[in-house]
Structures are given as structure tokens and as C-alpha cells.
Amino acid sequence: MTTHQIRQKYLDFFSARGHEILASASLLPENDPTTLFTGSGMQPMIPYLLGEKHPKGTRLTDSQKCFRSQDVEEVGDNRHTTFFEMLGNWSLGDYFKKEQIPWLFEFLTKEIGLDPNRLFVTCFRGNDSLGIPRDTEAAELWKKEFESEMGNGKWEMESHDIKVVDFPERDGLQGGRIFYYDEKKNWWSRSGEPDKMPAGEPGGPDSEVFWDFGDKLRLHEESRWKDSLCHPNCDCGRFLEIGNSVFMEYRKRV
């Protein structure tokens, strides 16, 4: 399957679900002094996520051209590049997690044909000091999606194997399928973690999907992280992030 086919499948998938297809915004952001270049699909959507009405409605989808100069030092591994297109679907006060997560799972497994046995997901652990709760809703929705694959002849695990791991960066995979991380890994804003966000900046927890290249390639064992436990956000390269759902629920106060 080519990149063009994947792009078209994505846009068609969400168009069939009531989304208007948008053209890619400029790589040079308009009315956004926070960055030199458009570095994510989220960036051009910020005004509308803050309440401005979009002329195309409340359900939108696009393939946004992105440039990340900060990733130039990472080019050469199996996960980073400086220029890419980011596929996105946007809900402006319309649907939320209970629609987004099943749709993403359906697109990856049915439209693209990825093996669900190789998919692993992460959710936000929460931060008590900031009053931001653990995203148990996203974790439960993901669990239901994985459970829905049972009985189709392809799923290699049992229901009790859809395990949720609380501290994978400390404890490793632990046979898990769903993993909680803190705001260093599962939070999105243009500025990064909540303590780096300026007043007025929107942000929120996210839920990421990773593809597992498997242990047979020995990517972890032959990396410089071999003496630590592997997990979805390990830098060894065994796991590749292929999707991210951001839930923009917060705005930084003064």
C-alpha cells in the first residue's frame, strides 16, 4: 500500500463519517508566533479548538504538511524525519472519545489491515497536583476494541491478557496491552507539558497507538537501552508510534 493510498483511504474514511476534507495549511503558520513552521496537524486548528467557528463545520479531516527542525538530530533511526504529512480528523465540539477511539481502531485494522496483535496503546496517567484525572475512559474504550477482535481467528490473546500497566517506564511491558504514562509522554500542547504552557495555551491528554516490530528482530537487545526494560515509549525502536488522539480539554490559566 502506497502513502497516497493510505492518505486517500483516511480522508475517504472520515468523509464517509460526515467530515469535510480540508486542504493542507501553509508550512509557514499564519497568526501563530509560537513556532517558525507548522509542526503538527493540530497547529492550524488551534483557533477553532478555542471556539472560533470553522466555515466548513464541526467535523473536519485533512493531511497536513509538517516540518520539525528539532527532529533533525534524530534522523537516522526508524522513527524520526523532518518533513512529513500528518493525517488528522477534528471534532469541534461534536464527538469525543467514544467515537474517536473505535474509529481509529477500525481504520487501522480494517481499512489498512494492520494486525491488532501488533498494536499497543498508551493513555494519560493523570496528575493529582494539577487536578487532572487519569484517563480511564480512554483505557476502557481501547480494551473494548481489543476484546471485539476475539473470536475472529486472528487474535492470539485471551480477554484476561488485555492487561493495563501503570508504570511501564519503570516496570516494562509486564505482558500489557494498554499503558499509562505521565504528561511527559501523554500530553499535548504547542509548548509541551502543562508546566511549560503559557497562559491561555490550550492542551490536553492524549492516547497513542504503537506498532510492535516484535522481539524476533532483537531491536531492544541490540540497542544501548538493552540493560533497561523495554516498553512502548522505549527509544530502542521496537515500538513505533503510528497514531495519536489528543483530547483538548484544558486551557492554562494565569
Q: Language-model features: where?
A:
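Structured aminoacyl-transfer and RNA-binding surfaces used for tRNA recognition/handling
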Residues: 1-254
